[in-house]
Amino acid sequence: MLIPTSGTANILGQSIENKPEDIRKKIGYLPSEVNYYDGMSSRELLEYHAGFYENVNTEKIESLSTLFELDLERKIEELSFGNKKKCAIIQSVLHNPEILILDEPTSGLDPLMQNRFFELLEEENKKGTSIFFSSHILAEIQRLCNRAAIIRKGEISAVEDIQSLLEKQMKKARFIFTAQKELEFIEGVQNPVWTNNKLTFDYMGPVKDLIKWMNELDLKDAVLEEPDLETIFMNYYQ
């Protein structure tokens, strides 16, 4: 834990300048690139790590290594990048941290292990762990997080609930009628275009208002395309 050259930082209501060792015990960290000393087995490494904390149940090493199919007896230098990442995942949650900081955590994991990792995070979150998840794979953010911060050029451009971010963005809609008709558009409808009996338009506004309007119309079909988090992210960079 580095002491700031200027400014202040508080974690769990406590200044990092006061008893930083106490704060460290409450934090789990998973770096994007994992580097360990050679010569130890995965088991030795994890048991060594557990020794820095009180009341760590070492049975958790066994259960998590089974979950991630990690051979605890293999030497660190013999492990692939993906298996080193599995070891680091176990290390980050072994002491039941109150805050978990993850930097590009799924790099090196195959799809099966990624899914098991996501399930582990969901379990940890249900136990009360706050998780900070940094990733360029925005589908992961959308799946796992309830709030997102968008960072551009080292500064935070937005911090909002995921659902709020999605609702504030432009949606594309397509309505199909039995025939073209005169309509009174609700607020938020932009760029309406008729093509025979099909109306396409952009919509910016509450989804519930759009659904209410749809129910008042005699529609054959309707399609509403919600923007994904990647589209929203790119809007902040344009």
Language-model segments: which ranges?
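Conserved ABC nucleotide-binding domain
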Residues: 6, 58-78
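Conserved ABC transporter NBD signature motif
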Residues: 7-18, 22-23
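Hydrophobic anchor residue at the start of the ABC signature
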Residues: 89
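Catalytic Walker B motif of ABC-type/P-loop ATPase nucleotide-binding domains
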Residues: 100-104, 109
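ABC transporter nucleotide-binding domain
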Residues: 117-203
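C-terminal coupling/interaction segments
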Residues: 202-238
